Amino acid sequence: MAKKLIPTYESVADELTATAEAVRSQMFGMPCLKRGSKAFAGDYHGAMVFKLRGEAHAQALALRGAHLFDPSGRDRPMKEWVVIPAEHAAHWPEFARLALETVVEAR
């Protein structure tokens, strides 16, 4: 029986930079993915962060351990950004595509 591979930030980034107009960049000192000048996903201490809205935002926050992204650590979270821990890595590719749509729609 073949072992199912768990997505990593690198595998998600590889897929989106190969198939979408996404590029690797940096945001707050962390590796991130951007479309144009807009960041939509990033690698944060072994978790991934995603810029999400609406139902996708609610679904992400419903995952155990997920929370709003607070890069300053001063209780000032970025309201559209959700940290999804590695235990939910199987969902990362889906949330990355939804986050990409968020910045595409904003154009």
What are these regions (language model features)?
Residues 1-107:
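Charge-dense, helix-prone N-terminal extensions
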